């Protein structure tokens, strides 16, 4: 395992976050259990990467049931592909207006850099529109993020998620108890590239994964994400919601 110095933390974490997929808020997110001053979401996962993260909500303002905002702060400790380890602080502004949302990195005196960190890639907040029935589809997406030491030349990493397909609703066990949740299945792939780590060029192989998100309407969250990569399985779960 390689411990990443501080200059690499912001560059390595997006790779982990992009594996979790992009997401935006649902229209009823303003009334979610966690959307209040002092609200907390904790997640943990293992597999091709492991993660422990905590997000805290503060300065919550609600204009009505569909328009609200909050500061989202916290931290994430992670290990990716057995090569990258590190920790990052989370500091974002979350704005919700109906079925749309935005998450902006807070960086006083600097321009927010979505390529180095973007909390939207956690995907736990859903797909931007309510799930109505099995067979419903959400469009494919692609992203381009910088990989490598930001103090040196970086390499763009392309990530593609295939079309998402909703399966039949099922009852699953979650940290909030038994819930009726929608499975949302899709492929997620990254292209092969190279990254500069402490002045050493390291090849990064392509990553091809099959994903199943379990979106639970009662919680307004993807409470569990199952990841299959090269015959190995991993799980990312919401462990606590307050």
Predicted regions and their residues:
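Sec/Tat signal peptide C-region and signal peptidase I cleavage site
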Residues: 23-27
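Acidic, serine/threonine-rich low-complexity disordered tracts
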Residues: 28-107, 147-242
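Extracellular-facing segments of soluble proteins and assemblies that are Gly/Ser/Thr-biased and enriched
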Residues: 104-156, 161
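Bacterial N-terminal signal peptides that target proteins for export
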Residues: 2-15
